[in-house]
């Protein structure tokens, strides 16, 4: 057998198996291969198993006893924005509420202003810096949402820039249209006018230019209510978009129920999801994307991961990287939050940031596991075992990232 790249002397491979999201007890079913190798050819995994194997290769990497994991997938981010909001933290510490800050022109509106005013080059450079940080922490595929333009011209601009990122970064980019992220200030007196604008102007234009695979809506009190969210998502579905929902984050907005009724590929946040919402999501095969970075940053309760897993929902994890509620690109930190604060087991967490996260962006056939035929997205981790990586929190355990781009493979040494 002849390979392009051979990774050998791996102490152990940890990987879920398959192409479909895992739920319940299956989330813990991780294949472990000791004293292992991975062979790569034409950007795909040719073979993976126990050493030694009769394989020759043009290039070789000595893993030096490190563990190997599938490349991580971040299924929920807001990478495409400009500016930061650390000044709001200082106000919060002085006792200002989010509404107080919003009335002063802060909150999401300040990010919308900064994003609208930023040049294309400034937005691209900021996004590339964030993607570089994510890659260094083992993330090889990233979902990126629009949502800081909030008018047709700006939302289309952000999506076009996301598509430019695909050729500028080694990280794979999956764009999502989130024109319904917030009600723009100019439409606050009549939010339905903005809903009509999203439906009649934005969605057809996004589809015409093939700028995004998914349509997302922030279904929440103070953003888009159930009926508004339902209307936008129904129209998006008619146009052929796959659906995502920011659901039940701060209140029981019935976003979970809506995700199940409309067959959304994922429902994200879910801190306040109902049993009915869970059951409808389970029936629809919707992936629950949990975002503990938000709970940590806002000092709010975490989503009940154990409840969701035990009721049979496939759970994924993401950073929700954004400047207002989760300003971190570090998915490893999110994994530790899930381990420590959400009582998820190490094997469940690995599934949640690999296969299930891939399925939350419709990539389960291509990535998320170390198996023959899957894309060669692999991370070498300097840790004695899987639990140690989440137990020893706050540092980067990734030593090397192996990333397929087409038929080629890029090797990025982190340490």
From Swiss-Prot:
The cellular component terms of Gene Ontology attached to this UniProt record, alphabetical and capped at eight, are: cytoplasm
Please tell me which top-level EC class this enzyme sits in.
hydrolase
Q: Which InterPro entries does the record associate with it?
A: Amidohydro-rel (IPR006680), HutI (IPR005920), Metal-dep_hydrolase_composite (IPR011059), Metal_Hydrolase (IPR032466)
Location relative to the cell = Cytoplasm
Could you tell me which Gene3D superfamilies the record lists for this protein? Metal-dependent hydrolases, Urease, subunit C, domain 1
Query: Which cofactors go with this protein?
Result: Zn(2+); Fe(3+)
Among the GO molecular function terms of this UniProt record, one is: iron ion binding
Q: In which residues is 4-imidazolone-5-propanoate bound?
A: 85, 148, 181, 249, 325
Cite the cofactor comment.
Binds 1 zinc or iron ion per subunit.
Record GO biological process = L-histidine catabolic process to glutamate and formamide; L-histidine catabolic process to glutamate and formate
What EC number(s) does its UniProt record assign? 3.5.2.7
The yes or no answer to whether the keyword Hydrolase is present is yes
What are the binding positions for Zn(2+) in this chain?
A: 76, 78, 246, 320
Name the residues that bind Fe(3+). 76, 78, 246, 320
Which keywords does this Swiss-Prot/TrEMBL entry list?
Answer: Cytoplasm, Histidine metabolism, Hydrolase, Iron, Metal-binding, Zinc
Residue sites binding N-formimidoyl-L-glutamate per the record: 148, 322, 324
Q: In which pathway does it act?
A: Amino-acid degradation; L-histidine degradation into L-glutamate; N-formimidoyl-L-glutamate from L-histidine: step 3/3
Write out the catalysed reaction. Answer: 4-imidazolone-5-propanoate + H2O = N-formimidoyl-L-glutamate
PANTHER family linked to this entry = IMIDAZOLONEPROPIONASE (PTHR42752), IMIDAZOLONEPROPIONASE-RELATED (PTHR42752:SF1)
Annotated family: Belongs to the metallo-dependent hydrolases superfamily. HutI family.
> Which function does this protein serve?
Catalyzes the hydrolytic cleavage of the carbon-nitrogen bond in imidazolone-5-propanoate to yield N-formimidoyl-L-glutamate. It is the third step in the universal histidine degradation pathway.
Record's protein name: Imidazolonepropionase
């Amino acid at each position: 057998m002849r390979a392009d790249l051979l990774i050998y002397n791996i102490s152990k491979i940890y990987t879920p198996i398959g192409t479909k999201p895992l739920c319940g007890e299956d989330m813990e079913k991780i294949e472990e291969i000791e004293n292992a190798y991975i062979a790569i050819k034409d950007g795909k995994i040719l073979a993976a198993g126990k050493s030694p194997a009769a394989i020759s290769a043009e290039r070789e990497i000595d893993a030096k006893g490190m563990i190997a994991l599938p490349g991580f997938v971040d299924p929920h981010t807001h990478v495409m924005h400009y500016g930061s909001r650390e000044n709001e933290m200082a106000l919060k510490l002085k006792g200002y509420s989010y509404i107080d800050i919003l009335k002063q022109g802060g909150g999401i509106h300040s990010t919308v202003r900064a994003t609208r005013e930023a040049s294309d080059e400034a937005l691209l450079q900021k996004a590339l810096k964030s993607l570089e940080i994510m890659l260094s922490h083992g993330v090889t595929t990233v979902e990126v949402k629009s949502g800081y333009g909030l008018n047709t011209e700006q939302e289309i601009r952000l999506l076009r820039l996301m598509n430019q990122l695909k050729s500028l970064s080694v990280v794979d980019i999956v764009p999502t249209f989130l024109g319904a992220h917030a009600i723009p200030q100019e439409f606050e007196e009549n939010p339905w006018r903005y809903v009509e604008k999203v439906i009649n102007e934005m969605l057809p234009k996004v589809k015409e230019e093939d700028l995004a695979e998914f349509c997302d809506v922030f279904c929440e009190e103070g953003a888009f209510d159930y009926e508004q969210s339902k209307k936008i998502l129904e129209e998006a579905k008619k146009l052929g978009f796959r659906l995502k929902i920011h659901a039940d984050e701060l209140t029981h907005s019935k976003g979970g129920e809506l995700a199940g009724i409309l067959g959304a590929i994922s429902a994200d946040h879910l801190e306040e999801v109902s049993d009915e919402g869970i059951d409808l999501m389970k029936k629809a095969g919707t992936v629950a994307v949990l975002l503990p970075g938000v709970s940590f940053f806002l000092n709010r309760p975490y989503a009940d991961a154990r409840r969701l897993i035990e009721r049979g929902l496939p759970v994924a994890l993401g950073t929700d990287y954004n400047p207002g509620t989760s300003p971190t690109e570090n998915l490893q930190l999110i994994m530790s939050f899930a381990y420590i604060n959400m009582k998820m087991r190490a094997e469940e967490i690995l599934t949640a940031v690999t296969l299930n996260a891939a399925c939350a962006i419709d990539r389960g056939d291509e990535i998320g596991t170390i198996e023959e035929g899957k894309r060669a997205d692999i991370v070498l981790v300097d840790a004695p075992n899987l639990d140690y990586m989440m137990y020893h929190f706050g540092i980067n355990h990734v030593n090397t990232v192996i990333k397929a781009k087409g038929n080629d493979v890029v090797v990025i040494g982190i340490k």
